[in-house]
Amino acid sequence: MLQTSNYSLVLSLQFLLLCYDLFVNSFSELLRMAPVIQLVLFIIQDIAILFNIIIIFLMFFNTFVFQAGLVNLLFHKFKGTIILTSVYLALSISLHVWVMNVRWKDSSSFRWTNGLQTLFVFQRLAAVLYCYFYKRTAVRLGDPRFYQDSLWLRKEFMQVRR
């Protein structure tokens, strides 16, 4: 079971990774003159998103609901966050690769192709949704109902058995 002190630590780590993601999304364009620094920031951002995915799944595995065999219930409740986070990771990696390819040799020019602008807008839109849904999921996973046997869990288990 996830204890309060551990949950606070995990939640703080998740929010720290989200803040880093927000920081890179906000200020990475200011570093276009230093492509190596921008590349390092992008790599760390992608790793932070991947760590957030791993942390959410570890929190799933720690729940009583998961241990009782109701994996489908957890994934049904949180499938939006799982899908959105995966899409956001793919969009972020795509944007980072494209930006680095366009600007690596000539970082002093400010080139934006139509495709790059479109990808940029979708990645930033996905970033807003990712932050909202990820925070909501992280807080909802702190609900004690997920970590102990309860009437709610028994009802859900009976519905699955039917």
Swiss-Prot record:
Keyword field contains NAD: no
Transmembrane domains' residue ranges: 7-27, 41-61, 80-100, 115-134
Glycosylation (residues): N6
Protein topology in the membrane: Multi-pass membrane protein
Function: Required for ciliogenesis.
Disulfide bonds: none
Keyword ATP-binding: no
Entry's localization field: Vacuole membrane; Cell projection, Cilium
One protein family per Pfam: TMEM138
Alphabetized UniProt keyword annotations: Cell projection, Cilium, Cilium biogenesis/degradation, Glycoprotein, Membrane, Transmembrane, Transmembrane helix, Vacuole
Protein name, entry field: Transmembrane protein 138
Organism, scientific name: Rattus norvegicus
GO CC terms: cilium; vacuolar membrane
Stated family: Belongs to the TMEM138 family.
GO BP field: cilium assembly
